[in-house]
Amino acid sequence: MKILLTANDITIGGGVERVVCNLANAFDELGFNVEILSFYQKNEKCPYTLNPNITLTFFPNTRDIHTKEPLKRLFNKTIYRFFVAWKMRQMFKDKDAIIYNCYFFPYFKNKGTKYFKIHHQVFKRSWTFKNKLFDSNIILTTKQLALWQSKIKNVQIIPNFLTQIPNQNTNLSQKVVLSIGRMSKNDEKRFITLVEIWQSIQQEKSFQEWQLHLIGEGEGKAAIEEKIKALNLQDSITLKPFTKEVEKEYLSASIYAMTSKCEGFGMVLLEASSYGIPCMSFDILTGPSDIIEDSKSGFLVADNDLQTYAAKLKLLMHDETLRQAFGKRAKEIVKEKFSKAVIMRQWLTLLDCK
């Protein structure tokens, strides 16, 4: 079976791009003929490892769909998008399945090809008609399923997977809380909120030996640094850049704290859980509630309830036995629901291969 996976720009090293590469490698390992189509190429190489058999193709002369020039924007939203669909039909007549992870849609199709779309963001009403062009729409979490099904019939839930589940577990006696993510200008991960929560916790002497490690880069990093200084938390909060040796960071932590306002899925929660780390998150629209079992593997807190979040975090910090119990269940959930073998069986069923 010949499969094509698309990406906006496979070279930028984002979360979606990593998912595309992981899925491509998994299909290749199952014996499929796999190709990735990237519409853009900001950097010279893809930052993620691809198996040697996988073909990487860049779409010829793709225009910048994010241009601010009004006439170009109008052209890109109308004529050019149809041109891309027509060109793809010509280029990929031999594909049995095309799995979209991009802004483009299959306005023109080949009869022998099935078309799928993985939605890495929340439901967009403006895309309802265009999403009906796909044979199946794949969403990552259950929380939005009812909304999707009220608008579109062809919807499936297939989560992301971890390529490997580590044998090692963290030592949960370490007094470190960890949070990882891109530090964007609009603070989507709400690191500043986490800093404010941390300030309230540090008022109590029994928690002053604990450290908060924030790992990430981005335009919003300076604002986070300023907030830490303004609240005089330099001694208990450490900012670190992104690292390829992220395993060391997980193995140095006893709690993972997420405060995001939105998540496509929340791969960091999976990764932390795979090391036996109990996780905390606000119960936002998508993501965390599929990974965290509240009061069993971690805590889910009503969105924006900072007081309760702080109280639950203090409870975990205070009780190592609770951390051990939550961490054990967290790892079990990853094995049961998010291993590569489990998720690829779902893909094979969708593709009528099993």
Positions of predicted regions on the chain:
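Conserved donor-binding/catalytic core segment of Leloir-type glycosyltransferases
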Residues: 4, 169-198, 213
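N-terminal strand-loop element at the rim of the active site
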Residues: 5-13, 26-75, 218-220
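Donor nucleotide-sugar binding/catalytic pocket of nucleotide-sugar-dependent glycosyltransferases
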Residues: 134-167
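Nucleotide-activated donor-binding/catalytic signature segment of Leloir-type glycosyltransferases, i.e.
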Residues: 225-241
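Aromatic "clamp/platform" in nucleotide-sugar-dependent glycosyltransferases that forms part
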Residues: 261
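Short hydrophobic beta-strand element within catalytic cores of glycosyltransferases
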Residues: 278-282
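A short, well-ordered alpha-helix in the C-terminal region of glycosyltransferases
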Residues: 308, 315, 322-349
